[in-house]
A protein has these predicted regions:
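N-terminal positively charged helical leader segments and presequences
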Residues: 1-69
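RNA substrate-binding interface of SAM-dependent RNA methyltransferases
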Residues: 71-139
Length: 139
């Protein structure tokens, strides 16, 4: 994770966010952050900046967020993709988000197994999650 992404609804009026999910676990276990450290943050569908760790408990981390950078533009690229195996689709979606692909169209073709269309990965929530993981890696 090269950037901590958050929803606008998570940001309080005093520019703070509290994390208690996988983002918190990553900051604690992988990055080994401590109070006072700065991390890159970005608002989903918004700008990016830095966040300073105010406090860390055994369950949450509080960040003070300063948004001061414009978001990177998307590449004007459209990907037309015959539905691959579900495991590969997750990887492809992550990579597309990392590279800033603007549009992704998933289509059926002669060689696509019909059972692939029943995959839970095609649920909007799962697609969004795969794209967010890619965005977090892109930084």
């Amino acid at each position: 994770m090269n950037i901590v992404l958050f929803e606008a609804s998570e940001l309080t009026s005093d520019h703070k966010i509290t994390l208690a999910d996988r983002r918190y676990a990553h900051l604690r276990d992988v990055l080994k952050c401590v109070e006072g450290d700065r991390v890159r943050v970005g608002m989903i569908n918004g700008a990016k900046g830095t966040g300073q760790i105010l406090s860390m408990t055994t369950a949450t981390v509080d960040l003070h967020v300063e948004i001061n950078e414009a978001p990177l533009p998307c590449h004007p690229t459209t990907l037309v993709l015959a539905l691959p195996r579900p495991k590969m689709l997750r990887r492809i979606l992550r990579s597309c988000a990392e590279f800033g692909v603007q549009d992704i169209h998933i289509i059926h073709s002669y060689r696509v197994e019909k059972s692939f269309w029943q995959s839970p990965l095609l649920e909007p929530k799962k697609i969004r999650q795969a794209l967010l993981v890619g965005l977090e890696r892109s930084g």
